[in-house]
Amino acid sequence: MTSIEPTHTGKKVIVGMSGGVDSSVSAYLLMQQGYQVEGLFMKNWEEDDNNEYCAAAEDLKDAQAVCDKLGIKLHTVNFAAEYWDNVFEYFLAEYKAGRTPNPDIMCNKEIKFKAFLEFADEILDADYIAMGHYVRRRDNSDGSTQMLRGVDGNKDQSYFLYTLSHEQVARSLFPVGELEKHQVREIAKEMGLITHDKKDSTGICFIGERKFTEFLGTYLPAQPGNIETPEGEVIGTHQGLMYHTLGQRKGLGIGGMKNSNDDPWYVVDKDLERNVLIVGQGGHHPRLMSNGMTVNQLHWVDRTGPVDGCHITVKTRYRQQDVPCTLTYTDEHTLRVVFDEPVAAVTPGQSVVFYDGEVCLGGGIIDQLIRG
């Protein structure tokens, strides 16, 4: 492995150690660059008594093993109260309102780059914090700092970090953002880190391995209703609108229908007033397509954002190909976005993130769809 010349001797970095391979290698790379590195493990959720979910204890054990191997200190902090107030209650409120939220984005905004940064600053006297996210930062000659997509396009996590401020990006380091995932695992294996072959965590932390419907049903009462076609024909029942999102194909419980073709059924709309789930056949059903959207709760990394009328690209969901679009400001808090070509399954309540090439500009929340 190529050795890295130490260049940052004395600067203190607190690395968010999750017990996974990305944060493990982040800590190692920063040590190689000459930083004074310490780890901080966050506990963000109080598990059930049987500790079946989230595996926080196992993650802490792995984080400690990595820190011991690297010879660095590991601190722990409990942000469960902050997580409940700022992330989980938002998650429930959005589902209750019939929207589909993204708690990972809110967690990054309120916990990993706010509560964590404040703790690292005030208690641990940090110069920087670091996370195992696949994004990059670029420091420009004019003193500004930009957030860029990660080198590994398949792992790029800029979509989840669009709410970061310019100041937060400037205080954060993202070592693995410069690497492909396979390189990260190779480094971890070469260094003998216990996490080198640990499976990536997926899903929402507080749900763990449980079925989503089972978990959500313990906090929000389900309201069963009808499943209808756009023409109003009742073809089934649902257990609750909150369990379904636009574009969903699996889990609808609709078999072969008389007089219908063989195309699969998709959720194309929700009628909240009537508690009806509307489905149509084919992934490009007209009710599933949007020509644009209005976006509110805007946040720009550089505070100013793109100019009115500009032509850039947008992601309306994670892992989606960028979509070319044109932006028009309705006011300083709201955008009208028109796509070059219609887009399927644009979902109110979800985040959209705007890009200028490799630069993540910021984003907002989908409010209403523009159709026809």
Swiss-Prot record:
The active site is at C107 (nucleophile), C205 (cysteine persulfide intermediate). Residues 102-104 are annotated as: Interaction with target base in tRNA. GO terms for biological process: tRNA wobble position uridine thiolation. One of its GO terms (molecular function) is ATP binding. Residues 155-157, 317-318 are annotated as: Interaction with tRNA. It catalyses: S-sulfanyl-L-cysteinyl-[protein] + uridine(34) in tRNA + AH2 + ATP = 2-thiouridine(34) in tRNA + L-cysteinyl-[protein] + A + AMP + diphosphate + H(+). Its main location: cytoplasm. Its EC number is 2.8.1.13. Belongs to the MnmA/TRMU family. PANTHER family: MITOCHONDRIAL TRNA-SPECIFIC 2-THIOURIDYLASE 1 (PTHR11933:SF5), TRNA 5-METHYLAMINOMETHYL-2-THIOURIDYLATE -METHYLTRANSFERASE (PTHR11933). This is tRNA-specific 2-thiouridylase MnmA.
